[in-house]
Structures are given as structure tokens and as C-alpha cells.
Amino acid sequence: MPNTPHTMNLYIKNIAQLVTCQGSEAKHGREAMGQIHTIEGPAAVVIRDGIIAFAGRMADVAPSMTEGCRELDATGRCVLPGFVDSHTHLVFGGYREDEFQWRLAGDSYMSIMERGGGIASTMRATRSESEDELKASARRHLSNMMKMGVTTVEAKSGYGMNLETELKQLRVVRDLQDEQPLDLYSTFMGAHDTAPEYKGRPTEFIEYLCREVLPEVVRQNLAECCDIFTEKGVFDHEQTRRMLTAAKEAGLSVKMHADEIVPFGGAELAAELGCLSADHLLRISDAGIKALAESNTVATLLPCTAFSLRADYAPARKMIDAGCAVALGSDLNPGSCFSASVPLMFALATLYMGMTVEEAITALTINGAAAIGRADTIGSIEPGKKGDLVVLQYPSYKFLSYHFGMNLVEHTVKGGRVVYTNS
């Protein structure tokens, strides 16, 4: 979406409470994650050419700093960094509302698969839909996320599991980057499951991805990262190592879906391979927690998925106390979690996962940024970083968990532009 210099210059004044989350790397453990660095008002933020030029006490703003800026009065309001959703399956075809009803009726995952549901259903729909159809659906989700204060979104492929459709999904992400305000981080996840053409032959499928799909993804510059579903019955450690090593050699960062269904040593492998993040972690072992705590790999937890599946939540409190850097993501997808609700993430993290509201804020800002390798440019409010902010309807960040389930966003600011206002 085109910007002019003027629209990217913004002076936010009279802020009741400014939450900066300052830092340029992931925050590990209870003490660091609990420090969100607030400035009580009146505070101000000045954004010039889309970049934060000042964040602090309003009395310290030099008049020359605000020349040519649009003014936004934040009297009685709290301002935070824009939220980073670091785990989504944004681009997909079709929906699985019938499958959700089957789950409510008690059907098992295997019985749903036998009825034609599960990931195979989404794969068939994604393969058949046009890029325009996929784009329209993804754009709608991004619009809803923007209204909840999200300013950066990670978006995976993985519902094609063949060359044509994986590239199609990633082209949709690329095109949407130019057609709407939010920043997108593109992840190639051809190894979401074994394609039906390779049923029972996961190692051969990984070789196909490494030999034919990954090189084309890289040649067309369609992804920054590569992800894989490492799980018993899906892809094992050897297959994961092969896929992610090939991706790293091709210049991509790497991530893993790990320890979601059973303890499988995924967290330990993610730390060993230098993954940006290990995600899900509902069944992480004590050894896995220790490995992540001693590494730079972010533990990205997805509470809405556990909620939707009526499963136990990831042990966030235990992980934070052990020294892990925890991020939160939505896991938006048409099957296990058809939601990207920021209010629900805050509620579940604080009420059911043992996190403080400060830790949840850290997890959705600077640690979310670290989970996609962008903590040096987003995730906090400080000079030199992108002007990505959320203005709440209330004077304190504590309302994010206290007034649970409600969208409290008054304005979303992306690169100095007000891209959403609650009217």
C-alpha cells in the first residue's frame, strides 16, 4: 500500500502509559520477560519516515521533532509495540467447519481422517483454488488481525506438498506484502506432512522437497525460513535434520513444529540445529526445556490450538522459570485452530498457562519478533525501530488480561501510518 513521507510522520501525544519492551533480542526467563519498561504519562512517541525517532516523556520532545507530523492524541490511553504473530498458516483453501462439529461430537482424529477430513482436506482445496481465491481469504484474515493490533505476521505454506501449490501459496504471501499494510514473514513448510503421492515413504518425500521444491523456492526468493512438522508418525529426527540442513545451506532460517503430540525430542533437536523457534511444545520434556533455556531458540507456544482441541496447555510457567524465551502465536489454520484472536491468546496465557500479563506482552512483542529473526527492527518502541504501535482504549496494559476476551485496540499504527481506528 503506497505511503507518502507525510503519512509516515506521526506524533502520538498525551500517552497515559507507554510500554516500550525495549531490547533487540529475545528475553529469557522470569525476570527479563517480566520487564516491559513502562513510562507513565504524559508520554509521547514521534515517528518520522516510518521509523521511531523518539519515545519517552512528552516534556522532552523538541518542537522541531514534530514538524510536519500528523498528531494523534492518546489521552487516557496505553500505547504498546505492535503485536507479532509469529506462527500462522495464513494461506489455505476451503474450511473444515464440519470437521469441527465431528470433533465436538467426540470423533477421534483418525476417524475424521477416514471421513476425508484433516490436513488432506485442506491440501485438496488449496491445490484446487486459484491464487486470487487464496489471496482473498488470506487478506480477510489479515484485516481482522490488524484490528487486534497485529502489525507483523509469519505465514507458512504447507497445504500443497507439491511444487506447484507450495509456490502458489508463497506467491500469495509475496503479493499480499505489497497489497496491504502488515509486514509478512514467509515460511516454506512443504514438510507439513507426507504428500499422498509419497504415502508411506516420508524419506523419499523429504528428498523430493530438498531436490525439487526447496531450490525453486529459493531461486524465486519466496521464503525467508523453512519449517517442518517433527513428530512421531510424521517426520523423524533424521528426516528433519536432512530438510533443515538443506534449507540452511540454501540460505534460509529454520523452525520446527516440535513435541506437540508426544515427547519426541523435538525441542532438543531444534536447539541443536539453531532453529529460530520450536513451536507447539505441548509435550516438551524436561530435557527439552533445559535445551531451549540454554539456547537462542525461542519457544513459541500456541494456546488457542490447545483450547480448540481441548488439550493440555504447554507448560509456559515451567519453561519461563527454567530460563526459556517464550513467544505466543495464534496458529491460525482451518483445522485445529481457526482463530487468530489476540484477546483469546492473552486470556489463555494468563488464566490457564500461568503467565503474567507482562510476560504475555513480551511474548507477543519482542519475543515474537525474535522468533522470526526481526527483533532488531520490530517488537519494541525505541528510536531506530519501525513505527509499529498499538493504542489501547484504556490507560493501562493490565486491561489486556483484566478485560478479557474483548478487543481493546483503539488504533493500530504500522510504520507511522494509522491503519486501523475503532469507530
Curated annotation (Swiss-Prot):
UniProt KW keywords: Cytoplasm, Histidine metabolism, Hydrolase, Iron, Metal-binding, Zinc
UniProt key word Amino-acid biosynthesis: no
EC assignment: 3.5.2.7
InterPro entries: Amidohydro-rel, HutI, Metal-dep_hydrolase_composite, Metal_Hydrolase
Coiled coil: none
Binding site for Fe(3+): 87, 89, 257, 331
Cofactor binding annotation: Binds 1 zinc or iron ion per subunit.
Pathway, per record: Amino-acid degradation; L-histidine degradation into L-glutamate; N-formimidoyl-L-glutamate from L-histidine: step 3/3
Stretch forming the signal peptide: none
Principal subcellular localisation of the protein: cytoplasm
Keyword Manganese listed: no
Annotated binding of 4-imidazolone-5-propanoate, by residue: 96, 159, 192, 260, 336
Annotated Pfam families: Amidohydro_1
Binding residues annotated for Zn(2+), in chain numbering: 87, 89, 257, 331
Cofactors: Zn(2+); Fe(3+)
Ligand binding (N-formimidoyl-L-glutamate): 159, 333, 335
Gene Ontology MF term list: imidazolonepropionase activity; iron ion binding; zinc ion binding
Root EC class: hydrolase
PANTHER family: IMIDAZOLONEPROPIONASE, IMIDAZOLONEPROPIONASE-RELATED
Function: Catalyzes the hydrolytic cleavage of the carbon-nitrogen bond in imidazolone-5-propanoate to yield N-formimidoyl-L-glutamate. It is the third step in the universal histidine degradation pathway.
HAMAP family: HutI (MF_00372)
Family the UniProt entry places it in: Belongs to the metallo-dependent hydrolases superfamily. HutI family.
Protein name: Imidazolonepropionase
Gene transcribed to yield this protein: hutI
